UniProtKB/Swiss-Prot annotation:
Keyword presence, Signal: no
Record's protein name: SRY-related protein CH31
GO CC, alphabetical: nucleus
One GO molecular-function entry: DNA binding
């Protein structure tokens, strides 16, 4: 979406992607949720002492 609309602000891109995400079924969301869990576990293994500090 960002490549197709290079002048679009990130906030607008986020809104549109959020709206598209809400339209997906649970089955369509599942691969993304599973990948996020896998990456989270990998990150925790590689960086066990990591603490989010905004």
């Amino acid at each position: 979406m960002a490549q197709e609309n290079p002048k679009m602000h990130n906030s607008e891109i986020s809104k549109r992607l959020g709206a598209e995400w809400k339209l997906l079924s649970e089955a369509e969301k599942r691969p993304f949720i599973d990948e996020a869990k896998r990456l989270r576990a990998m990150h925790m293994k590689e960086y066990p002492n990591y603490k989010y500090r905004p």
